Structure formats: C-alpha cells, structure tokens
Amino acid sequence: MDRNQWTLALMALMRFAHRAFINPVSPLPKFSRLAFTQGASRLYATLHVDAGLQDNVVDKAAKPYLSRRLKFNAEHFKQDVSELCTTLNADYNEGVMNAVLNTYKENFERGAVLWKATSKEDGVAFRFYERKKVDVVGPAINNSLISGNHGMIPLITSWANFKKNAIASCDFDPAKGLCKTWIWLGGRHPTRDLLVAPNVPGTIRSLERKLISAGLHTVRHAAVDWRSSTVNLYFWVPRPLTLPVVNTLITLPGTPPINEEKLTLMKPFFKPNGFTFATTIDTATGKFKRVSFYALRLDGNNLPIMGDQLATFFKDAPSNDKTEMNIVAWSFAGGSNGSSNYIKGERSYIGDLEQVLDAWGSPI
C-alpha cells in the first residue's frame, strides 16, 4: 500500500475506534479502549507528522491507566500496609487487619481508601470513604471492634443522621483497629445546627460562641475518636490564610502565635478563597486539644517541607488512583516550645478518592 492508501485505511480505522472503542457503553475494558486509541494515534503520527513532532502528537492522546489494581483487594492491601509499616517503623498486626477487613469488606470495596501518617514516628493509619449511607457503628460492635456501651455511640449516631444524605466513614490503625468514625454532613451547614443536634454533650454545645467568634461559622464534617473520646469538627473558612487569621485560630488550644517565617512555609499551598480547618475537642471538659490547617490537592512533586518521616511516607505509600490526591495539614496544640505541633499527611490509595470528594462538593 502506498502512503495515500495507508492514510485512507487509517482514517477508517480511527472512525471505527471512535464508535466501537471510545463509546462509553462499549463492552471492551477501559484499558483496551485507551491502549487501542493511543496505538492508533502513534501510527497516525508515524505516517503524517515529521519525526520531530511525533512525540507531541502521541502525548496528546489519552494515557491508559496502567495500574493492575483497579479495585480494592484485601490481600494486596494487607501486603501494602505491612510494607509501609516496615518502611516507617510502625506497628502492624495481621489479626487486627483481618478483623477490620472482614468487618468492613463491602465498605472498602465500594468506597475510596486513603493513607494517613504524621511527621512524628507514631505509626500509619488508613480510612475508607463510603459512597453510601450505611451503618458503620453496628458492625464495629458486632465484631468487637468497640464496646456496645461506649459513651461516644449516641453522639456519633446523632451526627450520622444529621441529614438524610450524611455518610459515615472510618479510620483505622493497622495494629490497634478502629480509631475514628468520620461523618460527611451532607454539605456545609451552620455550626449551631450541628451543636444543637440530639446527644451533643453540653461541654460541646457551650462552645458555640467561641467558635463563631473565631470565624468558624460553617461546618462540613464531624468525627469521634473511639480511643480518646474526643471529637473533631471540620470547618470551611472562606478567607485567605493570613497571619492574623492563623494566630486567632491557634489560640483555641492555647498555642503561642507563629511568625511570618512559619506562615511562608504554609501559605503557598493554600488557595486564596478559603481553607479547611479542624478542631479536636475533649468531650469531658470542652477544651480544645488541637487545631489543624489543611492544604488540599497538592502536587506530589511539589510538597511542603515536612521532615524525613512524612517525605518517606509520600514517596513510598502507593497510590493506585488515576488521579493521586495528596493532603498536608499543619497541626498545633498547646505548649510553649511547640513540641506538640506536627504535620499530617494523607494520600489516596485506591477507589477514585477524587470522584468521592468531588461528589461531596469538597474543596479537597
């Protein structure tokens, strides 16, 4: 065949590819469709583009998702958790992992999973983000992950039913088991509405004026920590990250003010329209234990200075999502020397975390 005949044949082939392979209802796997299209593009470049421009044409074709782990697999996950724990010198317990994965088998398979770690040498954690409104407390009780008379059950049950579309997720430690139950509240809501929900302790309700005075008007998520009996409230703060804003918020747990030098390490990673801010509160006393500022959707090749522990975490924690999600949070607690302050890191593992958070309207 001469060049013109090759051209006609290829054009017909590309039209066929568009109909049969790119069609979203095509029975062929996504990988096959993308690989075919990229191969056809490469052939077209070979026939029609000068050698120096061929790579540019191919680069514009859709790239296939090369991961072999398109869906959550418990055995693969245990292996990945074990290897990451070894790398970070963190505790790992096979029996605990089996109990967690057996209890929440469908949640892990249906949801999106992410890794968690801090700049301290305090282990590895992971979370599943659910896509459906399901009970996550009952299975934990039935499988002895928490006690059936735990004092935090009425509160988290109330928040899980705060709105009809609220969704519960869970955090785990690979050596200790269930750590937190975490609620997406179905959108952004006035802080007061969450505080007056049934079964919220008076110690938490009494914080309304202090939270509002600090500019924390809008709440997005809430969580309970089963081990420390603390609660986490996550707020949307629709303001730029400035020194006065930061120093106002870190006074909640009694943290001394930071300076401009510290702020310059944080600010480049925050968007100007606002940020996610979290508080940790002791339910027994109503005291703020910790606050955190979350920088979201970070480029894995342009992360903040965070120390060797977290740098290793982001390098070695595998992500099988098509779009990696990297999150860093600066966490402040009381204490004059800053020894209780640290940095938190989160990273997508599998299940298309970006899609879940986008569906929630999250700035993440």
Curated annotation (Swiss-Prot):
Keywords for the protein's UniProt record, in alphabetical order: Glycoprotein, Prenyltransferase, Signal, Transferase
InterPro entries, per the entry: Aro_prenylTrfase, Prenyltransferase_CloQ, PrenylTrfase-like_sf
Signal peptide: 1-22
GO molecular function, one term: prenyltransferase activity
UniProt key word Glycoprotein: yes
Class in the EC hierarchy, top level: transferase
Glycosylation site residues: 142, 337
Membrane-spanning residues: none
EC number: 2.5.1.-
Function: Prenyltransferase that attaches isoprenoid moieties to carbon atoms of aromatic substrates in an enzyme-catalyzed Friedel-Crafts reaction.
The family this protein is said to belong to: Belongs to the aromatic prenyltransferase family.
Additional free-text comment from the UniProt record: The gene is not located within a recognizable secondary metabolic gene cluster.
Protein name (Swiss-Prot/TrEMBL): Aromatic prenyltransferase
Native source species: Talaromyces marneffei (strain ATCC 18224 / CBS 334.59 / QM 7333)
Taxonomic lineage of the native organism: Eukaryota, Fungi, Dikarya, Ascomycota, Pezizomycotina
Gene: ptf
